Amino acid sequence: YLGSTDSLAFNVTQPSQVVISTSPSEIDRTEVATVEGMLTDGVGRAIPNRDLVLSVDGQEITSISVNSNGSFVGLVPIPPDMPLGPIIIGVEFLGEDFILPSNSTVVFTVFAPVSVTIDDLGPVAVGDEMTVSGTVKDNLENGWLDSHTIEVFVDGVLIGITSSQQDGNWSLQWVVPESVEIGNHSISAIAPAQGFYRQGSTDSNFTVSFHTEISLQVEGSYATRGG
């Protein structure tokens, strides 16, 4: 048998890895989520100077670049009307000749800040029934919160718990006890953290005064005209 040869061309590809170093975390509306990591090959060697795709819940939002040592940083602004709860931020390398594509994700949980108000309070006296009222809303212009728990404190002592209505208004009736001293007092309304809503609070003041009365005393039952 005479000798013979043959040849076959083939491509050698290597896997890639998008390694996100940012841990899952919480973020508020209007803040900016930062996602950091590295692009490496299958054995952890850096793959520098490539482009990656950044996405939120599967929707591409921008591209970011890998620097010369394989690191990347992606910034995701959270809109003021972002739906509350978990979102998935993805980083994807689309691959190229001889390098396979890869992707990775990290979860951020979106929260809303909460603002609470207390309506102006007039002076009251011991034994009077005082109405404490106000509003509660999130960061949106018409983001009034329904069925949101409000805790009311006087001088740091809890005096009652109430809940907001559909239009964000809340109120609490409180009878001023005899133990309250005459003078100025602080009052606070706190909306504890609830669901994906942060804690919100506000402070105000009111005055407790004495009840006064005027009594008239007439010395005689008769009066003389011109006398």
Task: Label each PLM-derived region with a short phrase.
Residues 68-75, 166-173:
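Aromatic sugar-binding surface patches on proteins
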Residues 29, 48, 68, 83-84, ...:
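Surface-exposed loops/turns
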Residues 9-14, 106-112, 206-210:
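Interdomain boundary/hinge segments at the C-termini of tandem beta-sandwich modules
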Residues 28-43, 74, 91, 127-141, ...:
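Beta-strand-rich structural segments
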Residues 1-4, 56, 78, 86-104, ...:
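Enriched for extracellular/lumenal, surface-exposed ectodomains of secreted and cell-surface proteins
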Residues 3-6, 40-60, 87, 104, ...:
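Short flexible loop/turn segments that cap and initiate beta-strands
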Residues 15-22, 112-120, 211-218:
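Proline-enriched interdomain boundary motifs that mark the N-terminal boundary
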